[in-house]
Amino acid sequence: MREYLNFLKYIKENGVLKNDRTGTGTRSIFGYQMRFDLQKGFPLVTTKKIHIPSVVHELLWFLSGSTNIKYLNDNNVRIWNEWATVDGELGPIYGKQWRDFNGQGIDQIADVIQMLKTNPNSRRILVLAWNPCVVPSEKISPQENVVKGNSALPPCHAMFQFYVANNKLSCMLTQRSADAFLGVPFNIASYSLLTHMVAQQCNLDVGELIWSGGDCHIYNNHIEQVNEQLSREPLALPTLKILRKSNSIFDYKYEDFEFENYNHHPAIKAKISV
């Protein structure tokens, strides 16, 4: 994934120093796009190890509509624990907005599947996670926001849109805030997996994943890790096999996915900014 390394290098060389909500500070650019042909391999970063179970379980959790971390923790995925209440609640985050937007019974995922099957040329096949009604206040903690009925965190990956051409399904992800080192490789993998799943449900081939970022940043405490990653040579991409076609987009299980030939460099540890 040379495209991703070029992205890191561009931020490192062109980013401006900015303060941020977490107090860590960033090197930041505004506006960047990467394109990945899903026919040429699954875009899983190889210059460090990506924890595949976290990618898969989080996506299945989103699709379930759940906003409690119990399912994740039961599967040894703890990427959301920092922001949850003692009861494991995160408020109306991604899953809630995807499956029941604003609590109004609007199942955006079911709607896009239906549109792809019946009107694939529509320009309205998109899903919003950004809901201004529940954006949390920066003046109080994530947990306090949840108590007030807001989400613990605002969605970083705010919108995605599907597009069909030549019987191929492409997805464009719009990410308002992009943690280039920790978050973006994970997001690319997650939405690539989702595109494969939706394509299978709609009897389509996969096309491209287009990743578009707004505020793209490297945290100041990730510079050393970025330099380490940039020193590594990318390896061949793995391939994804979906072992069965489930009855619906909501019925897939972790065991349905197999990532073949995922060869990678060692993991690079970095602290997440809370």
UniProtKB/Swiss-Prot annotation:
- Catalytic reaction(s) noted: dUMP + (6R)-5,10-methylene-5,6,7,8-tetrahydrofolate = 7,8-dihydrofolate + dTMP
Q: Mind listing the UniProt keywords for this protein, alphabetically? A: Cytoplasm, Methyltransferase, Nucleotide biosynthesis, Transferase
Binding of dUMP: at which residues? Answer: 21, 123-124, 176-179, 187, 217-219
Q: Does this UniProt record's set of keywords contain Methyltransferase?
A: yes
One Pfam family, please name it. Answer: Thymidylat_synt
Q: Which domain of life is it from?
A: Bacteria
Recorded hits in InterPro entries, A to Z, give:
Thymidate_synth/dCMP_Mease, Thymidate_synth/dCMP_Mease_dom, Thymidate_synth/dCMP_Mease_sf, Thymidylate_synthase
Q: What is this protein called?
A: Thymidylate synthase
Name the source organism.
Francisella tularensis subsp. holarctica (strain LVS)
At the highest ranks, the source species' classification is: Bacteria, Pseudomonadati, Pseudomonadota, Gammaproteobacteria, Thiotrichales
